[in-house]
């Protein structure tokens, strides 16, 4: 009894030290990069991800078992870009009666990029219509037009995007969320080092808009491991408006390096990122992401689907 109590106390203290719950269960097709999560009208979960011209899978539960279904754009993107046959970083949202999937085409590490849009009534394979590009960037721009996320807020549509350079920007979209109606505005910037901010996701909860983003080195951990603490992690800032003035929990502006850590490497979890937030009908707000399980391997192809319920009781998200 004493040994069991001591072990429980040790485990509790360990949990307090790192402060993060382990990822929720996943079975079936769990290898993934840059996930996007949604449910259809009958409650089936759909999960989209980078690779195979936007892979997608379905499951009856967020835990799985996940079944791979195919590709959203099996012939690649219609956008005239060198990355058209390798679209990445999907973001799926329901807009009216349609499912919208925003995606990126680019060459890694360049600004010759575009954010594209595909739509479907059902999300089934073969039903997606590619609408082409809605935001583009080129060498010399302040931003890189990849990693898009749509927030539908009443009658307004906000597209947040960006990666490195001047980091995260936002545009307002038209009523059917198919084209930009504004000039991109900077909403997050880390002035230090290489400005490693990307993968923004804007989520409204209560009276605040929470800007989640990935910070650090994302990929290639099997061949070149970054210095400790420089690997991917998930940060957040918040604002009372969706269009700017985001600050972290210490009051530091998100445009001046602010950002409160939500999830970082812990235990067997390494480099969590590529995140989104989904309002699950049973679990409430859920943070989902990809991560490396250090007991399995560090290659990009070995990254796994992770998720945790979010606690907003303090006014700031914690997992």
From Swiss-Prot:
Entry's Gene Ontology BP terms: arabinan catabolic process; xylan catabolic process
List each coiled-coil range: none
Site residues by UniProt (Important for catalytic activity, responsible for pKa modulation of the active site Glu and correct orientation of both the proton donor and substrate): 147
- Which residues does the record list as glycosylated? 53
Q: What is its EC number?
A: 3.2.1.99
Q: Which InterPro entries is this protein grouped with?
A: GH43_arabinanases (IPR050727), Glyco_hydro_43 (IPR006710), Glyco_hydro_43_endo_a_Ara-ase (IPR016840), Glyco_hydro_beta-prop_sf (IPR023296)
Q: Where is the signal peptide?
A: 1-19
GO CC terms of this entry: extracellular region
Alphabetically sorted, this entry's keywords are:
Carbohydrate metabolism, Glycoprotein, Glycosidase, Hydrolase, Polysaccharide degradation, Secreted, Signal, Xylan degradation
Q: What class of enzyme is it?
A: hydrolase
Compartment list: Secreted
Q: Which residues form the active site?
A: 34, 198
Name a GO molecular-function annotation: arabinan endo-1,5-alpha-L-arabinosidase activity
What reaction(s) does this enzyme catalyze? Endohydrolysis of (1->5)-alpha-arabinofuranosidic linkages in (1->5)-arabinans
Pathway annotation from the record: Glycan metabolism; L-arabinan degradation
Would the keyword Translocase be found if you checked this record's keyword annotation? Answer: no
Q: What does this protein's UniProt record list under function?
A: Endo-1,5-alpha-L-arabinanase involved in degradation of pectin. Its preferred substrate is linear 1,5-alpha-L-arabinan.
- UniProt record similarity statement: Belongs to the glycosyl hydrolase 43 family.
What is the protein name given in its UniProt record?
A: Probable arabinan endo-1,5-alpha-L-arabinosidase A
